[in-house]
């Protein structure tokens, strides 16, 4: 006849105290996360609400506008003036982002494949060197980059801006490398036995299997020029408003002489800039998350 041991009163008390402590920590953790979410969401909500305000300038007395209108969106999209050239800025940014998306994606995937799947002399040294370089912020090289572009007559040009974005993209290969490390070696070896070159293995075997990391790389490559202000401001410094990107144009609307007339339109522009990125994330969210998690697993 089997008997079941009954926990002593002391053990039961310890278990109860452990559950209470765990519950308290869980409540505190969720409260902290809720506070952080609130702090993060309030400026976004204010930007969105202000974009529908009938007031042209900043109104600190109200969080929710007294009256709502779509005029700010209509004005910034269909009525460009000497200050607000939003449709032109949007197209300039879109062109730079699309070109950089294609070039940077190719660079990142090729570098990641070479480091992950190819064995050559100096591979480890190159990998460690790239990781070390990534530890330093890109702004440290701004002056050198500017003078190089000036020497090549590429300042105030989209080609120079794209070159800067694409040229630095290859160093962000680590997540992609982690994903390529999970591709079975047997597949590549079988392809080599059939006479396939490294290029054919890369384009016909590895890339079709790498849709999550491909989406992740495409989104990141598109986001870099879409949200960048510092490099764009440094390179596109001619003062001609029609040559600006969205970030520079919207920043210009916050000048002291303009902010009381253009702030609500600035908010509308901020919302419009976020729409393409939001749609991109909603459509490709599944692949984006898969690319991060699978790439970080071994990377």
Place the predicted regions along the sequence by residue:
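Short, intrinsically disordered terminal tails adjacent to the first/last structured region
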Residues: 1-12
């Amino acid at each position: 006849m089997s008997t079941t041991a009954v926990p002593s009163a002391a053990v039961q008390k310890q278990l109860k105290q452990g559950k209470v402590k765990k519950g308290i920590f869980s409540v505190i953790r969720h409260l902290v996360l809720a506070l952080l979410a609130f702090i993060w969401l309030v400026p976004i909500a204010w930007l969105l609400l202000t974009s529908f305000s009938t007031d042209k300038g900043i109104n600190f007395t109200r969080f929710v506008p007294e009256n709502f209108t779509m005029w700010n969106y209509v004005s910034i999209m269909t009525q460009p003036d000497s200050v607000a050239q939003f449709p032109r800025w949007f197209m300039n940014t879109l062109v730079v982002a699309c070109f950089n998306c294609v070039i940077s994606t190719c660079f990142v995937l090729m570098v990641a494949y070479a480091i992950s799947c190819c064995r050559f002399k100096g591979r480890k040294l190159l990998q460690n060197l790239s990781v070390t370089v990534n530890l330093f912020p890109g702004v440290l090289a701004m002056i050198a980059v500017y003078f190089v572009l000036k020497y090549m007559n590429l300042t105030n040009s989209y080609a120079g801006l794209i070159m800067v974005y694409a040229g630095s993209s290859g160093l962000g290969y680590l997540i992609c490398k982690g994903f390529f490390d999970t591709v079975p070696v047997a597949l590549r070896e079988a392809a080599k036995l059939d006479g396939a070159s490294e290029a054919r293995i890369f384009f016909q075997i590895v890339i079709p299997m790498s849709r999550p990391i491909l989406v992740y790389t495409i989104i990141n490559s598109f986001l870099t020029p879409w949200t960048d202000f510092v490099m764009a401001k440094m390179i596109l410094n001619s003062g001609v408003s029609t040559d600006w990107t969205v970030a520079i144009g919207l920043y210009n609307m916050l000048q002291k002489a303009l902010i009381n007339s253009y702030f609500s339109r600035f908010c509308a522009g901020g919302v419009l800039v976020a729409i393409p990125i939001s749609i991109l994330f909603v459509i490709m969210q599944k692949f984006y998350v898969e690319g991060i998690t699978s790439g970080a697993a071994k990377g």
